[in-house]
Amino acid sequence: VGALALTVAGLGVVVLAGWALDQERLTRVLPGLVTMQPATALDFTLLGLSTAMLHLGWARARVPEAVPLLAVLTVVLIAGTGLVTELAGWRYPITVLGDMSQNEGRMSGITAVAHLVICVSLLAAVFGRRLVAHGAGVLALTLGVVGLSGYAFGASDLYDVGYFQTLALHTALGIALLGLALVSASGEVGLTRLARSGTVGGRLARTLLPAV
C-alpha cells in the first residue's frame, strides 16, 4: 500500500516539476498524447500522501489525522470544481501553468470523478466503513484500468469516448495504482476476501486477475 501510494505522490511531483520547468515529456509522456494538467498532478500528490498517512502504521503514529483529512478535502475542492464547471459549462478558475488548449485547463471529467471516488474511499476508511472504502477503491481501480485499456487499444479510440477525451496516460496509471492501494488496504472484505479464499470462486478470481 505504501509503495503504491508514494509512487503516485511521486508521479504528481514529477509532473508538477515538468510544468514548472517546461519539460513536455514529463507532462505528456509521448508526443501526440494529452497532458496531465497541474491540478491533476497536485491531486495525485495529495491523494498519494493521504493514502500513505492514513493506511501506514508508522505514518498514523506520527502525523495528526487532521493533516490527511485536510489534503483530502482540498482534492474534493479541486476535483469538484473541475467536474461542476465542466458539467455546467462554466469557466474553470484553476488555470495556473495549465494547457488551456486542452479542456480549458481543467482535468478530464473522468479524472475528476475518479479523484472524488478515491476521496470517498479515504474518508470511509477514516470513519471505519471498510466495505464502502473497499467498494470505492474497486471503482477507482476499474476506472484506471479502463483508461489504460483504452490506450492499449489505441489512444485515438479512447479520445472519442466522452469524458475520457482528455485522460492522460499517466493519469490513468495513477488512478489504477491508487485504486489498487485502496483495495489492498481495506482488508478482508469484498473482492480481496474472495481472491484470498480457498473456494472455487477464489481460485477463479486468482486465475483471472493477472489477465485483467
Annotated model-derived regions:
Residues V1-V212:
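Non-catalytic regulatory/interaction regions at protein termini and inter-domain linkers
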